[in-house]
């Protein structure tokens, strides 16, 4: 293909994917594999989501566990999690051929590059990754969400605010000895399930950013423990780092690939250092207003506002900068 035909193929494929994903979200109410009977998303949110996934933009304005059916997650989002990084890899190789082919015509075939990137790179890595994180407790099932009993009941006032010091006796809720009228006692919780592991693996490898759950890998079912956290972080850099060396090999000058990798690595270390120092020390405004605990027996301290409490500042900074 000439570069013009290659470009047209990329745009046509992406446009078709955008249309399919948009329609899946809007009409998911009428489609199968929707055990929760979730309504279709609004057209503007569907368009926003479709553009985000097709362009690999790392933007998510919805909660997948409550707003998307299993079909939309699998046939829509997971497919785009595969084909958008594959498209990026294909375009990279078209660029490499443009550098190296002096007399040859064309920059390769987009459909061949797309297929090879998906079958030989993304699918094997995703299969291995999905099996590993599923073994750590990430859901991978077609079963609908389950309702489970809480170990202890919790109470909320009429405005939906959690009553931290509430004493619960049946349906009666008291705080500091006074009965809270119209308080609601919650004894059950809905646990969202689905085939999360297969989507999370390629989400990390393809760096799309659209997770199965609304809070992505801060959700304990999407990222259960330190090992899954480490693995998912490594997935983020695996393919980008490898492509640096692929570039050097294909232009027949490995030093160029090493140079690109080292430039990326140094910028990463610089970014991690700046963010880590500032997040660990926090700011005087936060410390003065007691929003930051400098340290406790089980926590190294730092600005934990908006952070994943299970992993602390170190892992949070690493995830954010990677």
What does each of the following model-derived ranges do?
Residues 1-322:
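Membrane-proximal intracellular helices of multi-pass ion channels
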């Amino acid at each position: 293909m000439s570069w013009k035909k290659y470009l047209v193929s990329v745009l046509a494929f992406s446009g078709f994917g955008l249309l399919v994903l948009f329609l899946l979200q809007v009409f998911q109410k009428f489609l199968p594999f929707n055990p929760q009977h979730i309504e279709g998303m609004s057209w503007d949110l569907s368009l926003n989501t479709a553009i985000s996934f097709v362009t690999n933009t790392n933007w998510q304005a919805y909660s997948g566990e409550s707003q998307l059916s299993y079909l939309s997650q699998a046939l829509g989002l997971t497919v785009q999690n595969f084909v958008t990084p594959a498209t990026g890899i294909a375009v990279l190789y078209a660029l490499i051929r443009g550098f190296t082919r002096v007399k040859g015509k064309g920059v390769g075939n987009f459909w061949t590059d797309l297929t090879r990137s998906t079958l030989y790179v993304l699918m094997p890595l995703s299969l291995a990754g999905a099996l590993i994180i599923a073994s750590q407790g990430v859901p991978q099932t077609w079963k609908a969400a389950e309702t489970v009993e809480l170990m202890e009941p919790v109470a909320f006032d009429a405005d939906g605010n959690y009553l931290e010091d509430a004493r619960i006796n049946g349906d009666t809720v008291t705080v500091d000895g006074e009965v809270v009228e119209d308080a609601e006692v919650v004894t059950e919780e809905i646990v969202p399930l689905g085939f999360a592991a297969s989507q999370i693996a390629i989400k990390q490898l393809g760096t799309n950013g659209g997770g199965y759950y609304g809070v992505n890998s801060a959700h304990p079912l999407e990222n259960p423990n330190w090992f899954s956290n480490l693995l998912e972080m490594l997935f983020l850099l695996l393919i980008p780092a490898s492509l640096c060396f692929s570039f050097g090999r294909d232009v027949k000058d490995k030093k160029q690939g090493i140079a690109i990798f080292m430039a990326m690595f140094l910028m990463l270390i610089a970014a991690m250092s700046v963010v880590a120092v500032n997040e660990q020390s926090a700011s005087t405004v936060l410390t003065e207003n007691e929003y930051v605990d400098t340290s406790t027996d089980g926590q190294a301290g730092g600005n934990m506002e908006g952070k994943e409490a299970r992993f602390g500042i170190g892992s949070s900074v690493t995830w954010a900068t990677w």
